[in-house]
């Protein structure tokens, strides 16, 4: 998976005072988590306005403080914070920016967070058997592809879905476990992403799965 931008910083400019009703720009419908490190979680870009100029602000996610800072002279605040960690499935979360000087000045937004993952069922099967592929975290409005590599070379690319089936980038498909005639024994690498052409460093979210093909011998 590509490294998801996930730095935490509140930035404030300088301008003449001008206060309005507190509001926040809408959040994305879903964010992606691929690990507990901030760099493994998608960045949430926050923009809120209407606070007391230079007021002290606190940003929380699900009541947990993520960062603090001050509004600018316009009463505006921007922040870039990592999405919350999600190890399995998806869930909703609430992001809140509140002001210390005036507790009534509160801006909030809700969204969802999903883990990034791909599952093959059953896990053990003949390479030619049709199995179920499912995944989540592929949130681009684009097709979802699977690239099969062996020995460092792309052997086949298939399309699992024309587009994700939900805002959190889910898909399901039934395909041959390895769509190659008589695949060689050894470790095959399946990379699922949203790019038609394979790249070891894709520009979309990606998940890699190792499929081990073993050689069987018939008794005489």
Q: What label would you give each PLM region?
A:
Residues 17-220:
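Extracytoplasmic/secretory-pathway segments with low complexity and glycosylation-like composition
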């Amino acid at each position: 998976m590509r490294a998801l931008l996930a730095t935490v910083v509140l930035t404030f400019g300088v301008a003449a005072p001008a206060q309005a009703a507190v509001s926040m720009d809408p959040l994305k419908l879903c964010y992606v988590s691929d690990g507990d490190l901030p760099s493994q979680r998608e960045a949430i870009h926050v923009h809120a306005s209407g606070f007391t100029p230079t007021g002290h602000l606190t940003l929380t996610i699900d009541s947990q403080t993520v960062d603090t800072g001050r509004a600018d002279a316009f009463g505006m605040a921007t922040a870039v914070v990592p999405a919350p960690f999600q190890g399995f499935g998806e869930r909703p979360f609430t992001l809140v920016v509140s002001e210390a000087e005036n507790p009534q000045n509160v801006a909030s937004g809700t969204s969802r967070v999903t883990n990034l993952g791909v599952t093959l069922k059953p896990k053990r099967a003949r390479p030619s058997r049709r199995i179920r592929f499912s995944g989540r975290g592929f949130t681009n409005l684009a097709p979802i592809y699977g690239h099969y590599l062996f020995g460092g070379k792309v052997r086949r690319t298939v399309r699992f879905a024309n587009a994700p089936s939900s805002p959190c980038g889910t898909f399901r498909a039934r395909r041959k476990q390895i769509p190659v005639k008589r695949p060689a024994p050894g470790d095959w690498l399946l990379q699922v992403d949203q790019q038609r052409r394979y790249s070891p460093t894709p520009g979309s979210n990606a998940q890699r799965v190792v499929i081990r093909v073993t050689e069987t011998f018939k008794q005489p």
